[in-house]
Amino acid sequence: MHISKINFNYQARAIYSANPQTSRGRLFYETMSTIRSPFQRDRDRIIHSNAFRRLKHKTQVFIADESDHYRTRLTHSIEVSQIARTLARALCLDEDLAEAIALAHDFGHTPFGHAGEDALNEAMAHYGGFDHNAQALRIVTKLEQRYANFDGLNLTWETLEGLVKHNGPLLGPYANNKDVPIDILQYNTKQDLKLNCFAGLEAQCAAIADDIAYNAHDIDDGLRSQFLTLGQFEQVSLTAVLLKDIEKEHPQLDKTRRGYELVRRQITTMVEDVIKQSQENLAHIKPTSISDVQQAEQTIVTFSPTMAVYEKELKNFLFKNLYYHDQVLSRRNAAKCIVQKLFDCYYKNPNVMPESWHSKTAHLTNQELARLIADFLSGMTDHYALREYQRLFDCTNNFV
């Protein structure tokens, strides 16, 4: 086949989807690939990055080493990308862009999940704070250093916009009223990411895929850990209906397989709901371009009102019964202590950091030093953070 005849399915997209042929491009000019679309190249660069590999040993609720089968940021990101591609295909969007955003959406997370982020944000309180979405942008535009002609991954405008705004506008009447991290504002002077507008539909697919996958894997991990039981899910509206159907169709099924079946059906039910509701939203709004999507006064890829209530109930149940389980809270507090003590140690004596990091600390202001330490700390895996803690504080690992 002649290279020019490769079919990128450009004609299969809806008129309101992102189109790699009309991409806003990259910050640093690069010639177009003859064998991959710009969004495919973004996806591939993300997969080959150091940040992507480190997701293997970063966790969300359960700490690395507690079990080989608990989700990590890596497995979660792959699951999110699978759901995002399904949604994008159903809505005639660019699957590669949805996948790229999904695969990179957790790049900025610290070791030890949200406990680590809370601790680092507290440590950075006087230096601009810490936000995982802003950190993801720092990683893909600066901290990844793999290419000869630029720092970062030099991703397309559309992928960067999706990373920054997949949860909605950061400025304007539809923003969440939180302060916009300085790193995002500074980068926005180089490439206008339209912070007051909604992201494209591919980013919206990635965002809601994250919610679906998050609920599913927390059910699975909660059952696996025995912190949760199937009986408890009979008290939650959505899972109660699903469990009743499973019992009716497979009365002899053992509880382990019933748990797997519950997770599978929960994902399918939510995905089908999002597709149906999003199609209805599109039919109502009638966008004729990406600009119409970005200027819409609402998120378009959503749950139905009924499913939104069910999803909120499920999330509240998981927060109460899993995230605030005594053993999870104990590990969370230990994780926060580790991150806080590591930050304080590096700040007081930067020379204890690896040479590749402490060599950059000369002549830095206090704020610049704190940000460099945040870059170092947030990039750590759970394993590496534990090893650093043991090295610096000469203690045995009693964490897990």
Curated annotation (Swiss-Prot):
HD domain segment(s): 73-215
Cited InterPro entries: dGTPase, dGTPase-like, dNTPase_2, HD/PDEase_dom, HD_domain, PHydrolase_assoc_dom
Entry-linked PROSITE patterns: HD
GO terms, molecular function: dGTPase activity
Pfam families found in the cross-reference section: HD, HD_assoc
Superkingdom of source: Bacteria
SUPFAM superfamilies named in the record: HD-domain/PDEase-like
Keywords: Hydrolase
Biological-process GO terms, alphabetical: dGTP catabolic process
Gene3D superfamilies in UniProt: Hypothetical protein af1432 (1.10.3210.10)
The keyword Hydrolase belongs to this UniProt entry's keyword annotation: yes
Similarity field: Belongs to the dGTPase family. Type 2 subfamily.
Matches recorded under PANTHER family: DEOXYGUANOSINETRIPHOSPHATE TRIPHOSPHOHYDROLASE-LIKE PROTEIN, DEOXYNUCLEOSIDE TRIPHOSPHATE TRIPHOSPHOHYDROLASE
Alphabetical list of HAMAP family matching this protein: dGTPase_type2
Protein name: Deoxyguanosinetriphosphate triphosphohydrolase-like protein
Organism: Bartonella quintana (strain Toulouse) (Rochalimaea quintana)
